[in-house]
Amino acid sequence: APQAGFYGVR
């Protein structure tokens, strides 16, 4: 699961 991706997109 892309944790950094979630926050990165947000």
Curated annotation (Swiss-Prot):
The modification Arginine amide is found at residue 10. One of its GO terms (cellular component) is extracellular region. It is found in: Secreted. One of its GO terms (biological process) is neuropeptide signaling pathway. Its main location: secreted. Keywords: Amidation, Neuropeptide, Secreted. Myoactive peptide. Stimulates the contraction of the oviduct and foregut. This is Locustatachykinin-3. It comes from Locusta migratoria.
